[in-house]
């Protein structure tokens, strides 16, 4: 199977998943970008455009984080070092505190995709205070 075909296969899998979330507010940006609202958490889903090493990126902006706080940063780094986040990690992107999960698409199946997407709002709810 060609790398481009694999990326299209995973794009179709994600699109099918989003379509099956009938009640959820959602959006289709492109064949490589989607979003879904889970509670108050907007989960963004991306496929990289790298044909040979395509990756799935599932992320959410938690809040604006213009002025960084050393104590918060240290706490988040310590959380990232535990197993409590189940593969999800905190980070900073475009002056926002984010949660993200990155995985190569090789071997991804619909059940795992659903679990990955579901992790972000659960962890966001747990640590939003």
What are these regions (language model features)?
Residues 4, 8, 66, 107-114:
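Ordered, soluble secondary-structure elements with a strong preference for glycine-centered loop motifs
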Residues 51-52, 64, 105-107:
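Short, surface-exposed beta-strand-loop junctions and turns on beta-sheet-rich folds
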Residues 34-35, 54-56, 97:
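Hydrophobic residues embedded in beta-strands of well-ordered beta-sheets
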Residues 85-118, 122-129:
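Well-ordered alpha/beta subsegment
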Residues 57-96, 102:
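Short, internal acidic amphipathic alpha-helical interface segments
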Residues 1-44, 82-85, 89:
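Charge-rich, low-complexity N-terminal segments
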Residues 46-50, 91:
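Short beta-strand micro-motifs enriched in acidic
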